[in-house]
Amino acid sequence: MMSHQQVQMDLILMQGIWHSVLNMQNQSILLQLGSSSSMPQRPRLLSRVSQRGRQILNLESGRWRLSIIIFLETGTIQLTATILPSTDCQDI
């Protein structure tokens, strides 16, 4: 489990889908990240940024980049997922 100040995060695989469990002071949130078929590697935490009542968790899994923004005052969550382009060369 990864923790910092008021937010603890754990990554789990349930029924083929990666989830983030976010534990804040008085609540827990289960956040679906993506399927293990498209995201075969366990997501790993790249960075954690605290700024003005928010925590931003940046994760990666292969070509996937995920940003979880936690608004500490309200307990609301925003998830942004980006898939990087493939670097494999293909003959045309």
UniProtKB/Swiss-Prot annotation:
Keywords in alphabetical order: Eukaryotic host gene expression shutoff by virus, Eukaryotic host transcription shutoff by virus, Host gene expression shutoff by virus, Host-virus interaction, Inhibition of eukaryotic host transcription initiation by virus
InterPro entries referenced in this protein's UniProt entry, alphabetically: Bunya_NSs
Tagged with keyword NADP: no
Pfam families the UniProt entry points to: Bunya_NS-S
GO biological process, one term: viral process
Domain of life: Viruses
Entry function: Inhibits host transcriptional machinery, by producing modifications to the phosphorylation state of the C-terminal domain (CTD) of RNA polymerase II. Inhibits phosphorylation at serine 2 in the heptapeptide repeat (YSPTSPS) of the CTD of RNA polymerase II, suggesting that the elongation step of transcription and/or 3'-end processing is prevented. Inhibition of host transcription machinery leads to shut off of host cell protein synthesis and inhibition of the host innate immune response. NSs also seems to be involved in the nuclear relocalization of host PABP1.
Family: Belongs to the orthobunyavirus NS-S protein family.
Annotated protein name in UniProt: Non-structural protein NS-S
Organism per entry: Bunyavirus snowshoe hare
High-level lineage: Viruses, Riboviria, Orthornavirae, Negarnaviricota, Polyploviricotina
